[in-house]
A protein has these predicted regions:
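N-terminal pre-Walker A segment at the start of P-loop NTPase domains
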Residues: 1-15
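A cross-kingdom feature that marks ATP-driven nucleic-acid transaction machinery
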Residues: 14-22, 29, 38-45, 79, ...
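Conserved lysine of the Walker
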Residues: 32
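Conserved catalytic segments around the Walker B and adjacent sensor/switch elements
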Residues: 42-56
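Short glycine-rich substrate-engagement loop in P-loop NTPases that contacts/grips substrate
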Residues: 53-85
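Structural recognition of the conserved hydrophobic beta-strand(s) that form the central parallel beta-sheet
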Residues: 115-121, 142
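Short regulatory helix/loop adjacent to the ATP-binding pocket of P-loop NTPases
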Residues: 124-140, 153-157
Length: 449
């Protein structure tokens, strides 16, 4: 079983006096149910409902009174609950009972002693039904595919995981960690694929898992698409969209289709609500807060590199190239960095991820990511080579008068360089190995002390 880092966030939530019912969001098969089963070990009593099962779902049909509903559940499950002890109620697949969604506010108001987590593999179907969670009465967490730290722990590399977590990797372990990070990018972070790989160390056995995941996503389309036309568009995206991962996209005629910009945009947003992808928009300013230019072309980031590699047939490239930056023209590297950064954002309850483009006619300057660190904006470029070749990064630093630190993610060792742009601006460049991306905030904290 994989130890998920979000357990720490759940533990913190459970200890808060002002705790609200928690809605755990995430794509299908990222491990939401398993995570809550692990988390439940911190409780004296654990009651688990699956609203896909009629016996569990009918509890919400007997009454509108949450105390009566809870009493019915306890009798049905043959569980005696002491309200002076810690009790967790997990409502899985809650999208199957809209009434259960509405009643979360009353559990919060009338039974605050009860810890409640709700989850579902198709929460986005509530959007289609025009049903929303009670405003101000619930809080949210998001679970993504496994991070690199979770990959290390799952593959019996706990000592290396601790080195990464503490940011004290000795140079002697650098090549080993880079090799493991490349393998993590190849396998991806979907729990079923990761557990299978951890048990036999054989990438060739994972194809049926990836195929099953893709089939499942395709089968779900009809449940949240608004009409038959959108079903076809979403299935087109799920077939051809993986080849655009880590790249700036154009909505109109996406993937060689005849679909309009509006049709593709709406379909991509449906998939974004399903946590299958993210549309990351650019910023043109270099100040806090970062405000995305949503009229510009976004980058397409899918939920998992392992599914991406399988879908577009580039798995062998990882075995042919020693550097991740050489795999699929560098797009795989940008995809996996985006995945790792997204996990950091989620665990810190931050939402949006951006990249930067220079707002100047005729300019092609673009920085892969911009990261808000406290009151500053930090540019992040995924690139190897000499410092002189980081022209877009130099352009950003020249534009951002108050910025004095930048990050280059690369396959080399950790170091910090003093760099001067051609225009004379001096700044510090953190050369960050791929395996440290998930520790970006702590790395920046140390660098800015």
């Amino acid at each position: 079983m994989i130890h998920r880092l979000l357990i720490d966030n759940l533990t913190e939530w459970s200890k808060r006096e002002n705790r609200k019912p928690l809605v755990l969001r995430g794509a299908r098969q990222v491990g939401k149910t398993t995570l809550i089963d692990q988390f439940s070990k911190q409780y004296d009593s654990y009651i688990k409902l699956n609203l896909e099962q009629n016996n569990d779902a009918k509890a919400f049909a007997i009454s509108d009174n949450v105390a009566e509903i809870f009493q019915y559940i306890c009798l049905q499950k043959k569980i005696t609950v002491d309200r002076n002890k810690r009790t967790l109620l997990f409502i899985d697949e809650i999208q199957n009972e809209p009434k259960a969604v509405a009643l979360l506010r009353y559990f919060y108001e009338e039974m605050p002693w009860l810890h409640i987590v709700a989850a579902g593999s198709r929460l986005q179907t509530l959007i289609k039904q025009r049903i929303s969670f009670p405003v101000g009465r619930v809080e949210y967490m998001s679970l993504r595919p496994c991070s690199f730290l979770e990959f290390l722990n799952a593959t019996s590399n706990e000592p290396l995981a601790e080195m990464v977590r503490q940011q004290n990797v000795s140079p002697v372990y650098h090549d080993m960690l880079m090799s493991l990070f490349n393998r993590y990018t190849l396998v991806g972070g979907m729990p079923e694929a990761l557990m299978e790989y951890a048990s036999n160390n054989d990438i060739t056995t994972l194809s049926p898992i990836y195929r099953s995941l893709l089939n499942g996503y395709n089968e779900d389309v009809e449940k949240y698409a608004k009409n038959a036309s959108q079903v076809n568009i979403i299935r087109h995206l799920l077939t051809h969209g993986w080849a655009e991962a880590g790249q700036t996209i154009t909505f109109n005629r996406f993937g060689g289709s005849n679909y309009t910009s509006k049709e593709v945009h709406e379909a991509l947003e449906v998939l974004q609500n399903a946590f299958l992808l993210n549309l990351d928009y650019p910023v043109t300013a270099v100040k806090v807060p970062a405000i995305p230019a949503t009229t510009r072309q976004p980058k397409l980031i899918w939920l998992d590199s392992g599914i991406m590699n399988f879908s577009i047939g580039i798995q062998t490239e990882y075995l042919q190239n020693s550097s991740l930056l050489d795999v699929w023209k560098g797009h795989a590297a940008e995809q996996i960095v985006a995945q790792e950064l997204r996990i950091v954002l989620d665990r810190n309850y931050r939402n949006e991820q951006f990249f930067w483009v220079r707002d100047k006619k005729g300019s092609t300057a673009e920085v892969d990511f911009v990261w808000q660190h406290h009151a500053t904006i930090v540019p992040i470029e995924v690139k190897s080579g000499t410092n002189a070749h980081l022209r877009s990064l130099h352009s950003f630093m020249d534009t951002a008068e108050s910025a004095d630190i930048a990050v280059r993610v690369w396959p080399g060792k950790y170091s910090i360089d003093d760099v001067t742009t051609p225009n004379g601006k001096t700044f510090r460049l953190i050369n960050l190995p791929f395996y440290y991306v998930g520790m970006i905030d702590k790395i920046l904290d140390k660098a800015t002390d």
